[in-house]
Each structure stands twice: as structure tokens, then as C-alpha cells.
Design a protein with these regions (language model features):
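C-terminal motif of bacterial Sec signal peptides marking the signal peptidase cleavage site
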Residues: 12-14
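Buried hydrophobic residues that stabilize the cores of well-folded domains
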Residues: 18-287
């Protein structure tokens, strides 16, 4: 009986494999909830709750996501990984009807440097609906993405793997960084002519404190100021629609709550993140 229960537990959590090497304890996100609030014309307030539960295998890979809406199971996604931790397959089942049904499958392949090579999508009938391929030039430090419908994009990187430039057809974006690796801005072009641009500033702890978006004439269209409260562990900023967002962090930097307020100061969205410590293999090169 105990053996049967163990088998069932492994099937549910994706932990059928075994691992006998050294392990350590790391926090993993195990549950996420979203409360959405509605205010009616008569002033009455209502809200619904969406929840996602995550499960991991003994290697620390996220192998299952279960989505709930008002405590009713909505969808289940199962992931499969190779022995290097790359997610090579994702299958989603829709549980919103009377019977669960397959809704989407994604497969991926990687090279020996764990770089994505192909990504294929399949529909309910198992037919491939779209496909993408990625090629790399280590000497030129580029990555080229091509879709099966003829679209393509090439990206250039620096030695720290920061994106320097992207070209997709007649569109181009150029990125800038400071000497600490913070992205300080980007400039977009269409057919060689400047379009939108963005600029950012950071504090001495590499935290963004201001970001501004500019129109093609160089006029400031919108800006966001970020403030931090180290005692409370919060990061706050205004949103484009006049609202305000407050992010809450644990002492170790893990995000545990986000509050989104509208222009009238009413709470609209409440995001909460829950973690559990799980045993995972010790990464190579660490003790």
C-alpha cells in the first residue's frame, strides 16, 4: 500500500526520477493568487480570485502548473525537461468544460550550450500550427530568429549578453548601457528614421529611479518615477493611467505581493506569491 501511495505521489508531482547526489535547500514559488476587484455604479464592490499552484521535480524543475478560477480547476500544464534542465515540452489541458481537453502543446530543442534551436506549437488535433528556428554566430555575437511564415529577427549582443541591436524587417532598435550593465535607453527606427525612444536612470544600487519615453521629435511623452522604502521592502511607481503600483519584497529580494491601485486610490489588483523551501541538487561549481 505504501509503495502504491509513493507511486501516485510521484505521478502527481512529476518526481518519478531519483537523485542520489548532494542537495541543498532553495525557495521555490509554489502558489500565486490574483484578486481582482470591481466597483459597480451603485458603489458596491465585488471581486474574483484566480490561483495557480506549481509543482517541482527532484531537480527543482517546475513540472506542473494548475490554474484555478474561484476555486474551480481551469487548466493544467505539464512540462518535461532534458537532463540539463531545459524545458523541452509543455502540454496544456483545458478543464473549463465538462471534460478536460487538450488545448496546446509546445516542443523545444537546444544545442550543447543550452541555447534554444527550435520551438514548435501544435493544436488540439496534433497539427503543427507554427514553428520557429534560432541560429547563432559566436564570432559576430548574433542570434537569428526565423518563423515558418517568413518573419525573422536578428539580435546582436555584447560580451555580457546584453542586447545591443535588433533588426526585424524595416524595424530596428538600438540599446545603450552604463558601465555597470544597466540599460540606460533605447532608440527605435522605421526604415532608417527615428521613432520612439526611452531613457532610464538608476541609483548607486543599480535600482531604476526614473524612466521616460519620448516621441519621434524628442518630446517627453510619459515618465515614471520609482521610489523605494528599504524598511518596508517596497518599490512604488505611478502607472500610465494615473494609478499606482506598490511591490513588496522579502528581505532576500523575493517578490511576495503587488498592489495595483486606480487613479482614485482604490485597490484593483492584488497579486500574492507564496514560496516553500525544497531540496534541489547542488549546482556544479558550488559547494
Amino acid at each position: 500500500m505504501k509503495k502504491l501511495l509513493l507511486i501516485l505521489l510521484c505521478l502527481l508531482t512529476g518526481c518519478a526520477a531519483t537523485y542520489d547526489g548532494p542537495t541543498t535547500v532553495e525557495p521555490r514559488l509554489t502558489e500565486y493568487t490574483l484578486d481582482q476587484y470591481y466597483v459597480f455604479l451603485d458603489g458596491e464592490v465585488d471581486h474574483d480570485v484566480k490561483r495557480t499552484v506549481y509543482a517541482y521535480d527532484i531537480h527543482g524543475n517546475r513540472v506542473r502548473e494548475m490554474d484555478y478560477s474561484d476555486d474551480r480547476l481551469f487548466s493544467v500544464t505539464k512540462m518535461r525537461f532534458d537532463d540539463r534542465g531545459n524545458m523541452i515540452e509543455s502540454i496544456t489541458w483545458d478543464h473549463s468544460g465538462w471534460l478536460p481537453k487538450f488545448s496546446r502543446r509546445v516542443t523545444k530543442t537546444f544545442d550543447d550550450q543550452n541555447r534554444l534551436l527550435t520551438q514548435d506549437y501544435y493544436d488540439f488535433w496534433g497539427r503543427k500550427t507554427s514553428s520557429s528556428t534560432y541560429t547563432y554566430d559566436d564570432q559576430e555575437r548574433t542570434r537569428t530568429w526565423c518563423s515558418d511564415d517568413g518573419d525573422s529577427q536578428i539580435t546582436w549582443y555584447d560580451e555580457q549578453d546584453n542586447e545591443l541591436r535588433q533588426v526585424a524587417g524595416e524595424y530596428e532598435t538600438v540599446y545603450e548601457y552604463d558601465d555597470r550593465g544597466n540599460m540606460t535607453g533605447w532608440q527605435s527606427f522605421e526604415q532608417g528614421k527615428p521613432t520612439d525612444s526611452y531613457r532610464a536612470r538608476y541609483d548607486d544600487r543599480d535600482r531604476i529611479i526614473w524612466g521616460g519615453r519620448y516621441d519621434p521629435a524628442g518630446e517627453l511623452e510619459s515618465e515614471t518615477t520609482y521610489t523605494y522604502d528599504d524598511a518596508l521592502g517596497t518599490k512604488s511607481y505611478d502607472t500610465y493611467d494615473g494609478g499606482r503600483t506598490v511591490e513588496h519584497y522579502h528581505a532576500d529580494g523575493r517578490l511576495h505581493m503587488i498592489e495595483d491601485f486606480d487613479a482614485d486610490g482604490r485597490l484593483v489588483f492584488l497579486h500574492r506569491y507564496y514560496y516553500q523551501d525544497i531540496q534541489v541538487p547542488v549546482k556544479e561549481g558550488t559547494s
